[in-house]
Curated annotation (Swiss-Prot):
This is DNA mismatch repair protein MutS. ATP binds at G641, P642, N643, M644, A645, G646, K647, S648. HAMAP family: MutS. It comes from Rickettsia rickettsii (strain Sheila Smith). PANTHER family: DNA MISMATCH REPAIR PROTEIN MSH1, MITOCHONDRIAL, DNA MISMATCH REPAIR PROTEIN MUTS FAMILY MEMBER. Keywords: ATP-binding, DNA damage, DNA repair, DNA-binding, Nucleotide-binding. It holds the Pfam family MutS_V. This protein is involved in the repair of mismatches in DNA. It is possible that it carries out the mismatch recognition step. This protein has a weak ATPase activity. GO terms for biological process: mismatch repair.
Length: 886
């Protein structure tokens, strides 16, 4: 719909000036919900009002008519805006904030009493551009990403930025790994070319990952335009100042910066130069595996019960975010992994230091996000105070290290704590300027210390002691005139005035007393001195707030000059938090330092699943540990055995141990020797409650296909019940072939759980495949799952025992036992004939009488009969009754 059509639709020509102003702004932001500031409220009109009233649960009213059409309206108080924004952002709406750029008085002075207050959009809030603490999760990043697919389509470029922390990164991603990389980052919003709207990629991003896509015209990503944006933003003359980057990376960075400029209205934070990373520096974990292993969220999308929630004992927000990033991006470089492990080991060996540091870290603030708010002019005095207190605490933390080690600290610890020395100049600046009781809102005043600026002190003196100055002036005028009854009073018409009785009028001789008003018994005067005092008193509040804002802006600009240092300090504190956290959980849960090799070792002794173990501990139960010994000669474990015996837990725990080890943490085991894993793949079905919705055979095959296509020799594959979604013969054939492919072609490490016992014969001709099963203890018809993985193959699945534990009716279990017995008496190759015989001999709706059930009923009946007491008639009736039972 073009502009003329829009104006016609909304009766623009007959609308009031204020409503025309609204429509002009709305027409320029049709893709947004427009919140229009009117006094103390943000109002919404027309369709926006109807939508917002439903989403926010607020009353829908009307604001008169526009022509014949009634104007729908709803609004929210300006001071509660963030509460309502939270709901809108959660629903993925794009919100434009339209503020008043002048006061009504200023508008009147500019254009008379009919002038409309000037308004404009000051910011557009989207899921990927939030910085408000109340609107974003404190313990995870909030990424905006731009994805650029070059014409060759072999490698895509991805730039992602967290506006709340000023982190900006660019990476080239193989086309086949785009979804996996997006799953790692979990961006809140993705910029994509309009040309890709109908592509399979866009469909997968939306349907599989459920991420918000914001489409932009193709020219938004144009190379020359994006290059100019980058050069202008970073004030560079040559794009090489960014580093060695491709054309598509330039487009990705430039489009992100342009989008930030459009949404923040030029008020973009001081972003550092983008960090260029190598995609292969991190372990690849596809989106399905992340979901199956519940790394940062559980199957419902919450953090509770996830690996992150189990490992996260950090004490700062920035530390929590860093741990989130570590878990999302395990390392693949042995040197870097060992560097982290050495840091963890240092703290594990110094638990007393850890205890002190963790207590001190609790006193620090999230200065990354404080700094962002400062650079975007959305901060308060409390942000500066947070920086001051953090600077102070940082120096104390450094003293803890030197008290214990002096100058003999390992180099890798020295490097971490170097920024903790503080910045005396910055600390003193804030300490000398910002009041300890500084309010959240600059408009409330009282943020600058009085002694910092004489004018601030003077204005606050007027505000606090105005009555005293009036009293002094009154005493002065009484002395000058000799009128002891002279008063200084106030009314809303003439303001402050000197009031004397009519009989004393002859005593007013000095011409400085200017007549204002005469009443029956009183005469009122003013003086230039009184008028000046009144003006100062009336304007003192406004003047001091204006002056404080000016001074505050200057202080903030000086803080921004220290941005690089503050980011290093934040990085140091978050790193300390994470590594102290690793030491803490290693001590608390008995974790061990893993050893890394450059071969295919995966030697875990007494490994445990950290999440399951913690859940069992809450119930005062013990976790049954297990070994896993994969190597070049024994790459594949084929695991058979009953359901509910712990197969899935065993599979997951080994994948999780690899992830934990490669983030630099100790692991839940007695010992661990691991050849670096470059990719982890996990195929686990819906029956294990780790995938939302109903799993299908096609979904299973698609995931298995992707695993076989993307795995390398250094990958770890976890497969659970491949082939179960189709017929037995098809399933066995597929599982067999998949195992052969992994063994002969991929030659990588694999844990393969199955209920197809036919596969166990493969160990006879696949030398790197070994059979393992779950230990079972049988006692009559009862079984006990021991949860131990042992060498060997299961001879049956014990499915009927699990069914009985699940509470299936006894008659169903008994009948199933009969049918199973017939199958077991017949060779596997004749299974089809068994079913045919059953269907031919028995009606579809008829079950052969259950002998076990009949026997139990007869036993029960006979137990109540005393033959010596039966009459002939009762005996005959009993015979008929028994006949009915059989």
């Amino acid at each position: 719909m073009n502009l003329q059509e829009l104006k016609q639709k909304y009766n623009y020509d007959v609308a009031t000036k204020m409503m025309q102003q609204y429509l002009d702004i709305k027409f320029a932001h049709l893709d947004c919900l427009l919140l229009f500031r009117m006094g103390d409220f943000y109002e919404m009109f027309y369709e926006d009002a109807i939508l917002a009233s439903n989403v926010l649960g607020i009353a829908l009213t009307k604001r008169g008519k526009n022509g014949e059409e009634e104007i729908a309206m709803c609004g929210v108080p300006y001071h509660a805006l963030e509460n309502y924004l939270t709901k809108l952002i959660e629903e993925n709406y794009k919100v434009a904030i339209c503020d008043q750029l002048e006061t009504p008085e200023e508008a009147k002075n500019r254009g008379g009493y009919k002038a409309v207050v000037t308004r404009d959009v000051t910011r557009i809030i989207t899921p990927g551009t939030i910085i408000e603490e109340n609107l974003i999760a404190s313990a995870e990043p909030n990424y905006l990403a731009s994805l650029v697919i070059p014409k060759n389509k072999e490698t895509a470029s991805l730039c992602y930025v967290d506006l709340s922390t000023s982190e900006i990164v660019v990476v080239n991603v193989p086309e086949t790994e785009i979804l996996n990389e997006l799953a790692r980052l979990k961006p809140r919003e993705i910029l994509l070319s309009e040309n890709l709207r109908s592509s399979n990629l866009a469909d997968s991003i939306f349907k599989q990952l459920n991420f918000r896509i914001t489409y932009q015209v193709d020219s938004f990503f144009a190379i020359n335009k994006c290059k100019k944006i980058i050069l202008d933003f970073y004030k560079m003359k040559d794009i090489k100042g960014i580093g060695e980057i491709s054309s598509s990376q330039i487009c990705a960075i430039g489009s992100v910066l342009e989008y930030l400029s459009l949404t923040q209205k030029q008020n973009i934070p001081h972003l550092p130069i983008p960090r260029i990373i190598n995609f292969h520096s991190y372990m690849t974990i596809d989106f399905s595996t992340r979901r199956n292993l519940e790394i940062v969220t559980n199957s419902q999308g919450d953090s509770q019960g996830s690996l992150l929630s189990t490992l996260n004992h950090t004490v700062t927000k920035q530390g929590g975010r860093l741990l989130y990033n570590f878990l999302s991006s395990p390392l693949t470089n042995i040197a870097k992994i060992n560097h982290r492990l050495n840091i963890t080991e240092f703290f594990y060996s110094n638990l007393e230091i850890v205890k002190k540091i963790r207590e001190l870290l609790k006193k620090t603030s999230d200065i990354e996000r404080c700094l962002t708010r400062i650079t975007m002019n959305r901060s308060s005095g409390r942000d500066l105070l947070s920086i001051k207190y953090t600077l102070e605490t940082a120096t104390i933390i450094k003293e803890v290290f030197f008290d214990a080690y002096g100058f003999n600290l390992p180099d890798f610890i020295e490097k971490i704590i170097k920024p903790l020395s503080g910045d005396a100049e910055l600390y003193n600046l804030i300490d000398e300027t910002i009041r300890e009781d500084a309010p959240n809102n600059l408009n409330d005043g009282g943020i600058i210390k009085h002694e910092y600026h004489p004018k601030v002190a003077q204005l606050h003196d007027l505000i606090n002691n105005g009555k005293l100055y009036i009293e002094k002036l009154k005493d002065q005028y009484r002395k000058e005139t000799g009128i002891d009854s002279l008063k200084i009073s106030h009314n809303n018409v003439i303001g402050l005035f000197i009031d004397i009785t009519a009989k004393n009028v002859n005593k007013i001789l000095d011409p400085k007393f200017i007549h204002r008003q005469t009443t029956v018994n009183h005469v009122r005067y003013t003086t230039a001195e009184l008028q000046k005092l009144e003006s100062e008193l009336v304007n003192a509040k406004t003047l001091v707030i204006s002056l404080e804002k000016e001074l505050y802006a200057d202080i903030c600009s000086q803080v921004i000059e220290k941005a690089s240092y503050l980011r290093m300090l934040a990085s140091s504190l978050s790193g300390l938090d994470v590594f102290c956290n690793f030491a803490y959980i290693a001590d608390e849960y008995d974790y061990v330092k893993p050893e890394f090799t450059d071969d295919l070792s995966f030697d875990i002794v007494k490994g445990r699943h950290p999440v399951v173990e913690k859940a069992l501990q809450r119930e005062s139960k013990s976790f049954v540990y297990n070994d896993c010994h994969l190597s070049e000669l024994e790459r594949i474990w084929l695991i058979t055995g009953p359901n509910m015996a712990g197969k899935s837990t065993f599979l997951r725990q080994n994948a999780i141990i690899a992830i934990i080890a490669q983030i630099g943490s100790f692991v839940p085991a007695k010992s661990a020797k691991i050849g670096v894993v470059d990719k982890i793949f996990s195929r686990i079905g819906a029956a294990d409650d780790l995938i939302k919705g109903q799993s299908t055979f096609m979904a299973e095959m698609l995931e298995t296909s992707a695993i076989l296509a993307q795995s390398t020799k250094n990958s770890l594959i976890i497969l659970d019940e491949v082939g179960r979604g189709t017929s037995t013969y098809d399933g066995v054939s597929i599982a067999w072939s998949v195992l052969e492919y992994i063994h002969d072609k991929l030659k990588c490490r694999c844990l393969f759980a199955t209920h197809y016992h036919e596969l166990t014969v493969m160990s006879n001709f696949l030398p790197a495949l070994q059979n393992y099963t779950i230990a079972i203890e049988e006692s009559g018809k009862d079984i006990l799952f021991l949860h131990n993985i042992i060498s060997g193959a299961a001879d049956r699945s014990y499915g009927l025992h699990v069914a009985a534990l699940a509470g299936l009716p006894e008659s169903v279990i008994n009948r199933a036992e009969q049918i199973l017995l017939k199958f077991e008496k017949t060779s596997t190759g004749k299974g089809k004939n068994i079913l045919s015989t059953e269907s031919n001999n028995l009606s579809l709706f008829y079950l052969e009488p259950n002998k076990t059930t009949i026997s139990s009923k007869l036993d029960k009946k006979f137990s109540t009969i005393d033959p010596d007491k039966l009459s002939p008639k009762e005996a005959l009736e009993l015979i008929y009754e028994l006949k009915k039972l059989v």
